[in-house]
A protein has these predicted regions:
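Long, charged, low-complexity intrinsically disordered regions
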Residues: 1-79
């Protein structure tokens, strides 16, 4: 399951992220991929701040080389 936030304004992107995380939790997804793009890194920082404080996210990391690298964050969801 993945969410593409590229090109979105921060407020809209973070609203979509919250909804996405809720749906992923309800679906029992073990992990999620969030595509925020590389750009200036502002959206990446905001996404990771939300993930850091989300009760159902246990950890997150930059996507692998074949997943999009620094333009993607992969979050592990709690059981």
């Amino acid at each position: 399951m993945e969410l593409d936030l590229r090109g979105m304004m921060s407020e809209d992107a973070l609203d979509k992220l919250e909804t996405y995380l809720d749906k992923a939790t309800m679906a029992g997804m073990p992990f999620v991929r969030i595509i925020h793009g590389k750009g200036t890194g502002k959206l990446r920082q905001e996404v990771r701040a939300v993930l850091k404080n989300h009760p159902h996210v246990t950890s997150f990391e930059e996507g692998g080389e074949k997943e999009g690298g620094e333009g993607v964050t992969v979050a592990k969801m709690s059981d």
